[in-house]
């Protein structure tokens, strides 16, 4: 199954729908571009944490309930959805996080976890930015 990040734009075709992988890759690339210009304001560890947050911030969208909301071809029994921010935040354990960023400590993991979770809350609380 191919997972998507957002629904098809109004009047758009299914070919315009962005896959979840492409969205996450684009987000990482955007952060890397930002760091090319402004990276001197951040430590290497801070940059690594931000890149990792970008890499996983929407992984919680890879669930059948969310996908059925943005893909009407999927037929799922109506059920309460766990917000994708909760799921995204839980995709990376402290151990896996420290494998990606060996110099990270527990406080860094807490900041990362909070950032991933809150990135999703921004989407939930701003309905004009939601596309599903």
Task: State what each model feature region is.
Residues 1-78:
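Acidic/His-rich, divalent-metal-binding segments that scaffold phosphate/diphosphate chemistry
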Residues 23, 57, 84, 122-123:
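Histidine-centered divalent metal-coordination motifs
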Residues 26-32, 83-97:
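An active-site-proximal "capping" alpha-helix that borders the catalytic cofactor pocket
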Residues 38-52, 98-122:
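Acidic/histidine metal-binding catalytic segments
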Residues 55, 64, 90-100:
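Generic short alpha-helical segment signal, independent of protein family or function
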Residues 75-83, 107:
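Short coil/turn segments at secondary-structure boundaries
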Residues 123-132:
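Single conserved hydrophobic/aromatic residue that forms the stacking wall/gate
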């Amino acid at each position: 199954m191919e997972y998507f990040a957002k629904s098809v734009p109004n009047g758009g075709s299914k070919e315009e729908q962005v896959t979840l992988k492409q969205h996450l890759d684009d987000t990482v690339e955007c952060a890397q571009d930002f760091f090319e210009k402004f990276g001197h304001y951040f430590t290497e560890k801070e940059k690594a944490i931000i890149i990792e947050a970008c890499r996983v911030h929407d992984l919680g969208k890879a669930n059948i309930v969310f996908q059925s909301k943005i893909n009407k071809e999927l037929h799922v029994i109506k059920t309460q959805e766990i917000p994708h921010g909760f799921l995204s935040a839980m995709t990376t354990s402290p151990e896996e996080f420290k494998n990606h960023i060996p110099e990270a400590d527990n406080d860094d993991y807490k900041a990362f976890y909070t950032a991933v979770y809150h990135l999703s809350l921004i989407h939930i609380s701003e309905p004009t930015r939601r596309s599903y």
